[in-house]
Amino acid sequence: MGLIVYSDQVRELMERTDEMVTAADIAPILGMKAETIIKKAKEKRWDRGVCNYIVSGTRVKFFRVDFLRKGGWIQ
């Protein structure tokens, strides 16, 4: 079962955060806890073709091009 965040939601988030998204920022959209997002990112459970990410402390950086090219984010 996949969870999709549509590009308009992501675009709005990116405009607010200038490409740097905290796990806390994206957690409400994904319906997940920030801690779970960080854990999954660190364990590299996400498909690299869908979302590239870098985890640094409690911040997760998502690359704008990947979000918008795919039309959203798929878990």
Roles of regions detected by a PLM:
Residues 1-12, 58:
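Short, Lys/Arg-enriched anionic-surface-contact patches
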Residues 64-75:
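A short, Lys/Arg-enriched interface patch at domain edges and termini
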Residues 5, 52, 60, 74-75:
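Polar low-complexity intrinsically disordered regions enriched in Ser/Thr and small residues
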Residues 9-40:
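Polyanion-binding surface elements
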